[in-house]
Regions:
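C-terminal ends and interior cores of transmembrane alpha-helices
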Residues: 81-99
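A helix-boundary/kink motif common to multi-pass secondary transporters
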Residues: 40-41, 70-74, 101, 132, ...
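Helix-loop junctions on the cytosolic side of multi-pass membrane transporters
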Residues: 173, 177-203
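Juxtamembrane intracellular "pre-TM" segments in multi-pass secondary transporters
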Residues: 1-10, 192-233
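Short amphipathic helix-loop junctions that connect adjacent transmembrane helices
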Residues: 29-43
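Substrate-agnostic recognition of the 12-TM MFS/MFS-like secondary transporter fold
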Residues: 12-28, 51-64, 73-83, 104-163, ...
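Small-residue hotspots at the loop-to-helix junctions and early N-terminal turns
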Residues: 39-49, 141
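MFS-fold secondary transporters
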Residues: 36, 89-93, 112, 186-187
Length: 245
């Protein structure tokens, strides 16, 4: 917590991450409740639960894209505004009955969750550049704690907002849009200070499959040094826990 007071850039990034993660979490459980209001609730809820899981499948791909992004601060800000626009569209769609509108909401929800992961990946190099090496572990740990707290409190806040608004899904989506808007606006104020090391493009571009295989082998060799058996099962368990979290 002392790091927040000592490092203004870290405090700013933490505030932005808090607003973005809270915004992403608020609608996740509300989305399932919205699905339950569909004409065929059992089918819709099943689809909604699957939709919430899907962004986790793109985590590696999104992370690699974030690493390769050159102007990270610019995209960090732009994406927050884009998410605000997406949730304004979601707010409008929730007023339209039927599965067509529900399908559009599902798609926009997937896109927004993937963008939140992308923003998280963009923040890491900025943190590494602006935070002393001896404080990096504390900063990363605080980020993980912040994400967990936002995930739990955000869903609770979403249900509470839904209850006091008498299931006004459009209102909750609009509040989500505001959180994303604020998340980017607070970064825009100090955009020039959000620096990072230059991104070096690889000499030869490998396919996504090749890079995933290389990443898998590197991770496997690391765990092999620690004498961890059944690495494949362990990796699957970690991905599943991350998705459920």
């Amino acid at each position: 917590m002392k790091l927040l007071a000592r490092n203004k850039i870290f405090a700013l990034l933490s505030l932005s991450r808090f607003l973005n993660t809270l915004g992403a979490a608020i609608y996740n459980l509300v989305f399932v409740v919205f699905a339950a209001s569909m004409p065929q609730p059992s089918l819709a809820v099943g689809i909604a639960n699957l939709i919430v899981f899907i962004p986790s499948l793109f985590t590696i791909f999104v992370g690699m894209k974030a690493d390769r992004t050159k102007k990270k601060a610019n995209w960090l800000i732009r994406i927050g505004y884009l998410q605000a626009i997406l949730f304004i569209l979601i707010a409008l769609m929730t007023k339209i009955p039927g599965f067509l509108a529900f399908s559009i909401v599902c798609f926009l929800n997937i896109v927004s969750d993937c963008l939140s992961d992308y923003r998280g990946g963009l923040q890491l190099p900025i943190m590494k550049k602006n935070i002393p090496d001896q404080d990096l572990m504390e900063a990363y740990s605080f980020n993980q704690l912040l994400s967990m707290v936002c995930s739990i409190s955000g869903q609770a806040l979403g249900v509470w907002l839904l209850a006091i608004s008498h299931q006004n899904f459009a209102l909750v989506a609009s509040i989500n849009a505001v959180t994303f808007l604020l998340s980017s606006t607070c970064l825009l104020i100090r955009k020039k200070q959000l620096t990072h090391d230059p991104v070096i493009e690889p000499k030869s571009k490998n396919s996504l499959v090749h890079e995933c295989q290389e990443m898998y082998q590197n991770a496997k060799s690391i765990f092999a040094d620690e004498e961890v058996h059944h690495f494949g099962k362990l990796l699957f368990s970690l991905v599943l826990i991350n998705a459920l979290g």
